[in-house]
């Protein structure tokens, strides 16, 4: 019984994060999604605009309080503003 419960938990976790396998950023240079301070985010955001899992990515970043990088097409500052506007 315990093995079954553990497998169900693993399956649920895999399903929740399955969108990451379909993310376009997984096929590109991760450095562009985590630019140095003052660096350009243009290329990363361009990739996000064409990505089919953009909304799942943004939801994940907001739910997990991701503080670095471009997630769902938004920078950390843009995500912070979005959270404030939602409250």
Swiss-Prot record:
Reported function: Acts as a transcriptional regulator. Probably redox-responsive. The apo- but not holo-form probably binds DNA. Complements a whiB2 disruption mutant in M.smegmatis (AC Q9S426).
Subcellular location: Cytoplasm
Alphabetical keyword list: 4Fe-4S, Cytoplasm, Disulfide bond, DNA-binding, Iron, Iron-sulfur, Metal-binding, Sporulation, Transcription, Transcription regulation
UniProt organism field: Streptomyces coelicolor (strain ATCC BAA-471 / A3(2) / M145)
Binding, [4Fe-4S] cluster: 25, 48, 51, 57
Protein name per its UniProtKB record: Transcriptional regulator WhiB
Domain named 4Fe-4S Wbl-type: residues: 24-81
An annotated GO BP: negative regulation of DNA-templated transcription
Cofactor note (record): Binds 1 [4Fe-4S] cluster per subunit. Following nitrosylation of the [4Fe-4S] cluster binds 1 [4Fe-8(NO)] cluster per subunit.
Domain of life: Bacteria
CC cofactor: [4Fe-4S] cluster
Description of what induces expression: Transcribed from 2 promoters; expression from the stronger promoter is induced when aerial hyphae became visible and then declines. Expressed during exponential growth but decreases during stationary phase in liquid culture.
Description of post-translational modifications: The Fe-S cluster can be nitrosylated by nitric oxide (NO). Upon Fe-S cluster removal intramolecular disulfide bonds are formed.
UniProt-recorded Gene Ontology molecular function terms: 4 iron, 4 sulfur cluster binding; dinitrosyl-iron complex binding; DNA binding; metal ion binding; protein-disulfide reductase [NAD(P)H] activity
């Amino acid at each position: 019984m315990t093995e079954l419960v553990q497998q169900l938990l693993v399956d649920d976790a895999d399903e929740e994060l399955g969108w990451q396998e379909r993310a376009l950023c997984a096929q590109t240079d991760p450095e562009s999604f985590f630019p140095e301070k003052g660096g350009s985010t243009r290329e990363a955001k361009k990739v996000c605009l064409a990505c089919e899992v953009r909304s799942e990515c943004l939801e994940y970043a907001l739910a997990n309080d991701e503080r670095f990088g471009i997630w769902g097409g938004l920078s950390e500052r843009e995500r912070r503003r979005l959270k404030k506007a939602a409250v």
